[in-house]
A protein has these predicted regions:
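Acidic, Ser/Thr/Pro/Gly-enriched interdomain connector segments
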Residues: 52, 232-271, 310-313
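Sec-exported extracytoplasmic/periplasmic mature domains
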Residues: 66-74, 98-106, 173-176, 256-263, ...
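Extracytoplasmic/secreted envelope proteins and their assembly/folding machinery
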Residues: 58, 62, 66, 94-101, ...
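Aromatic- and glycine-rich peptidoglycan recognition patches
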Residues: 25-48, 157-160, 174-239
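N-terminal capping segments
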Residues: 24-111
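Sec-dependent N-terminal signal peptides of Gram-positive bacterial secreted proteins and lipoproteins
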Residues: 2-22
C-alpha cells in the first residue's frame, strides 16, 4: 500500500513536469508565431527561424522600434531620443535603442534597461557592457582583450560569421580600422537571400555609415560584412578566454567550476580574476600537462571540466 502511494506520487510528479514542459513549449511556439506575423519579408527571402525561444519582451521591443520607423531628426539635429538621454543634438543610434527599451519598461513594467540591455551613449560603451555581462559574440570569433571565444554548448570554437543573430540582439558596427564602435542596430530577423546568402535585417536610427543619416529605418547587412564587430546577445551562448584582471559573471562561473574541482574555496568566488584564481588555473594546466599561462582558455576549461567529471562518484 505504501509502495503504491509512493508510486502514485512519483507518477503525478512526472506528469506535472511533463505538463509544465508542454505548456512552456506551447507558449514558445505561440511567441514564435506572433513574431513571424509581424515580419515583412522580401519576395525572394527565406526566413531563418530563430534557434532559441523568443522572450516576450523582444516582441514588445521590436514592436516599439517598428513604431518609430519614419521618425526624422530636426534640422538642428535634435531628436526626442537624444533629448530623453540628456544629449539633444548628439549622434543618436544608441539613444534610439535605449529609448525603445525604456518605453517597453514603462508600458509593460519590465526592468530591461541596465539589466538585459545597456543604457548608454558613446563609443564602445554598449559593446563593453555586453562583454561585461558575458553576452557578447564577436563576428570573427576573437574578442579583443580576451582572445578566442567558444560555444558553451559543446565547447567548440566560434568560427567567423557562424553566429546567426537572434531577434532582439544588438549589432555593433565600426567605420574605422581601430575597431571602435561607431553604430548600433537592433536585429529584427535573419534570412537567406535569392543567392542563398545570409543577411541580417535590422531597425536602426542615425546610421552614420550612410551619406546623410537622419531617421529611423530598416536596413540589412551581409552576415560577413566587415563593419560588423559583433553582437550583444539576448542569451548567454559563448565563453571566452579569461585572465588576471578580468571580472564579471564569466569569472564567477569559472570560479564556481574551480570550487567544484576542489581547487578553490567558495569564499573566493568574487567575480574578480586575481592572483588566487590565476594560481588555480595554473594548477589545472600543470595537472593536465599544458602550458602554464594562468589564462583560462578553451583548452584549460576543457581540462577543468574533465577534472570535475573525474570527481563525480
Amino acid at each position: 500500500m505504501r509502495l503504491t502511494a509512493r508510486f502514485l506520487a512519483l507518477f503525478l510528479g512526472v506528469l506535472a513536469l511533463l505538463s509544465a514542459a508542454h505548456a512552456e513549449q506551447a507558449a514558445d511556439q505561440k511567441l514564435l508565431e506572433t513574431y513571424k506575423a509581424g515580419l515583412t519579408l522580401g519576395p525572394e527571402e527565406t526566413l531563418i527561424d530563430p534557434k532559441y525561444p523568443i522572450p516576450d519582451y523582444v516582441l514588445w521591443l521590436l514592436d516599439t522600434a517598428r513604431g518609430e520607423i519614419g521618425y526624422v531628426e530636426e534640422r538642428s539635429g535634435v531628436t526626442k531620443y537624444g533629448t530623453w538621454a540628456g544629449y539633444p543634438a548628439a549622434e543618436w543610434c544608441a539613444e534610439f535603442q535605449c529609448w525603445c527599451v525604456s518605453r517597453v519598461d514603462k508600458q509593460y513594467g519590465t526592468k530591461l534597461l541596465t539589466r538585459v540591455y545597456p543604457n548608454y551613449s558613446g563609443t564602445n560603451v554598449g559593446r563593453d557592457w555586453f562583454i561585461g555581462q558575458g553576452r557578447y559574440i564577436s563576428r570573427t570569433g576573437t574578442l579583443p582583450g580576451y582572445g578566442s571565444q567558444w560555444w558553451k554548448d559543446g565547447m567548440t570554437p566560434v568560427a567567423a560569421n557562424s553566429y546567426i543573430p537572434q531577434p532582439g540582439d544588438w549589432v555593433f558596427l565600426t567605420d574605422n580600422a581601430s575597431g571602435d564602435t561607431s553604430h548600433v542596430a537592433m536585429v529584427e530577423y535573419c534570412a537567406y537571400d535569392a543567392n542563398g546568402n545570409i543577411r541580417l535585417h535590422v531597425i536602426e536610427g542615425n546610421n552614420v555609415t550612410k551619406p546623410a543619416p537622419q531617421g529611423v529605418e530598416r536596413n540589412d547587412y551581409a552576415i560577413d560584412y566587415w563593419r560588423i564587430l559583433g553582437y550583444g546577445t539576448v542569451y548567454d551562448l559563448a565563453d571566452m578566454a579569461l585572465k588576471f584582471g578580468h571580472s564579471g559573471p564569466k569569472v564567477v562561473a569559472l570560479q564556481e567550476e574551480l570550487v567544484q574541482a576542489g581547487l578553490l574555496e567558495a569564499r573566493y568566488t568574487t567575480g574578480k580574476f586575481g592572483a588566487i584564481t590565476q594560481e588555480c588555473i595554473k594548477t589545472v594546466q600543470r595537472q593536465a600537462g599544458i602550458q602554464e599561462t594562468g589564462i583560462a582558455n578553451l583548452e584549460t576549461r576543457q581540462a577543468l571540466r574533465q577534472m570535475i567529471e573525474n570527481k563525480q562518484p
